[in-house]
Regions:
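Residues immediately within or flanking Cys/His clusters that coordinate Zn2+
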Residues: 188-191, 223
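Conserved phosphate-interacting/catalytic interface
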Residues: 1-186, 232-584
Length: 584
């Protein structure tokens, strides 16, 4: 995965220089060329601030260490720049950080003369007091001590000065050499082979660029570590911290910035987890099978199989060389107490992905509950939603397994089958139509898990299905409609009273229900009674020697599918002359 991320950075030209990172600055304290205070102004056209593609940056681990609290170069938090904090505990570290901010400004004055005016401004207690009073008046939204701030001298921001990158590169290298000389970066282990490039390097002591964008799924707002060894149990051979996965600082930053960029552009949150897909070579949006799975508006989902077949044929004929040999990658992530949890990682050929997505929609195809037509192909999140009461209840691990089933043409997880069955059963007992995506997933499970899956598992009713459990479900559907035709609404009917028992112990229950059906048949006129009698006999004839005494999870799910498809079939094909009489 890390090699794929490094390749993405190289292919896209993603800038990942140590000591620089994207930042968004919300405020600027302003002064003239002599350092006289002029005011505080917001930056950017929106409430978030002004985004910079690359600014000089120190890693969080470098800001707090044995040398005391340090500041960011030429920008920092409002609390430290203005000594503005409502929390008494924050005032000492903010003062220390403010002093370090001034120290960095002084070190830059020879290269960036405007920094001298900034030093004059921020060393003046009266100017700082006026700035604190002014910033408290800003908003909405109101300023916060943790907002980021820089200095504007005249009409130019310090961070925008042309000499800044060269000054910071030299200063940053000096800082790194100082850390190496104290052993914090080099330690006793010396040079090592870079895990990603194979070069001989001085490995980074920690990987300081955090993975951001996972705050809503267990991560921290400030980011989480992907490669981390902060416990002795995680280390080997006496290596400390991230030397257990030795990489130069540049390599560590490249994989982190690549993943951050992919999260921002491609990441999709799917019920407690984030799926981040990409391709080795760029793929147009209309050719992206991942989009078909996740977003799948109806018109897209309906043509997904045809589009996949078209792309596959083009690859085989050589008319789409851009797709032939292309590879896909997808990582499923969530946050966990400051660390990134990699829940799944898949990769493969584009051709395999297109075929898998086409099969996903084919296997999910199922009739509407009214039997009128095939249901619209469900979005991925509709499938997940059919397994739980609310999407937030979906386990991230289950979402990852379902994603793998869709993208890799793997078996539907058994845990998903159990949940889909439970939700469908509740709907049947309440005399409601179940979520069609749940029944579709049950069908897909059996399509992929059984040797007879593909010919037997049809979108519509299959009267020749090879499994008795399926026909047992069909029989209960017919008996329920027979009761309604004979008695009308009776409150708790056959389904409410016997569905659970019949789906678990069919031999014990269905025989008794067949015997009781004679009472219902006697209440119907001859033609309708004969019609129902033939239906019951036809289904019973599928049982063979005997009904199973008990049904396991797979059998109960086939029972539910047979029940559903029989109801859909009858609703669509009931005899016109008897429509009202047998309508349930």
């Amino acid at each position: 995965m890390l090699h794929a991320l490094l390749g993405y950075a190289q292919r896209t030209g993603l800038h990942a220089e140590p000591g620089f990172s994207p930042q968004t600055i919300r405020w600027a304290i302003c002064a003239d060329d002599d350092g006289n205070y002029l005011g505080v102004v917001p930056l950017g056209s929106d409430k978030k601030g002004l985004a910079f593609r690359l600014l000089p940056t120190q890693a969080q681990s470098a800001l707090v260490g044995k040398g005391g609290v340090r500041a960011q170069p030429l920008w920092d938090t409002v609390g430290s720049v203005l000594l503005w904090s409502k929390d008494e505990k924050r005032k000492p570290p903010d003062r220390e950080r403010h002093d370090n901010f001034l120290l960095l400004l002084r070190s830059a004055t020879e290269v960036i003369p405007e920094c001298q005016a900034a030093v004059t401004l921020l060393s003046d207690p009266d100017a700082l007091g006026r700035a604190r009073a002014d910033i408290e008046k800003q908003g909405p939204p109101a300023a916060r001590p943790e907002d980021k701030m820089t200095v504007r001298i005249g009409d130019r921001l310090l961070v925008d000065m042309a000499a800044v990158p060269a000054w910071w590169r030299e200063h940053y290298r000096a800082l790194q050499k100082a850390r190496e000389s104290t052993g914090k970066s080099r330690g006793e282990n010396g040079a090592m082979l870079d895990l990603l490039t194979g070069d001989v390097v001085t490995p980074a002591y920690t990987h300081d660029t955090k993975i951001k964008g996972l705050a809503g799924i267990g991560g921290l707002p400030q980011g989480d570590a992907l490669v981390s060894f902060d416990k002795a149990a995680f280390t080997s051979f006496g290596l400390e911290k991230s030397r257990n996965a030795a990489m130069a600082e540049e390599s560590a930053k490249r994989y982190a910035e690549s993943l951050n960029h992919l999260i921002q552009t491609n990441g999709r949150i799917l019920a407690g987890a984030m799926v981040v897909p990409w391709f080795k070579e760029g793929v147009a949006a209309e050719d992206d099978p991942f989009t078909w799975i996740v977003e799948a508006p109806e018109h897209t989902a309906r043509i997904a199989e045809a589009r996949a077949a078209e792309l596959l044929e083009a690859i085989r004929k050589g008319t789409r060389p851009d797709l032939a040999g292309n590879r896909y990658y997808a990582v499923t992530l969530s946050g966990a107490a400051g660390r990134v949890m990699v829940r799944d990682w898949i990769e493969g050929e584009f051709e395999e992905l297109a075929a898998a997505v086409a099969a996903w929609f084919t296997d999910l195809a199922i009739v509407w509950a009214d039997g009128s037509a095939l249901a619209s192909p469900p979005k991925f999140m509709a499938v997940v939603g059919a397994l739980v009461r609310e999407l937030k209840d979906a386990p991230a691990s289950l979402v990852a397994e379902l994603w793998r089933a869709a993208a890799r043409r793997k078996a539907v997880p058994r845990a998903a089958l159990a949940r889909a069955l439970g939700r469908a059963r509740l709907a049947f007992l309440a005399d409601e139509s179940p979520r069609v995506a749940g029944l579709a997933l049950i069908k897909a499970y059996h399509t992929r898990i059984n040797s007879w899956g593909y010919p037997a598992m049809q979108p519509y009713l299959n009267e020749n299905h090879p499994d008795v459990a399926y026909h047992a479900g069909r029989l209960l559907a017919v008996l329920a409609r027979l009761q309604y035709a004979a008695l009308g609404e009776v409150g708790a009917g056959v389904v409410q009273r016997y569905y659970i028992a019949a789906s678990q112990t069919p031999a014990l229950v269905l025989g008794r229900l067949i015997g009781n059906s004679k009472n219902h048949l006697s209440k119907l006129d001859g033609g309708l009674s004969f019609w129902f009698e033939n239906r019951i006999a036809e289904i019973v004839g599928r049982f063979g020697d005997r009904l199973p005494r008990t049904l396991d999870l797979e059998g109960q799910s086939l029972f539910a599918l047979g029940y559903y498809q029989q109801l859909a079939h009858d609703r669509a094909s009931r005899p016109a002359a008897k429509e009202e009489a047998i309508n349930a």
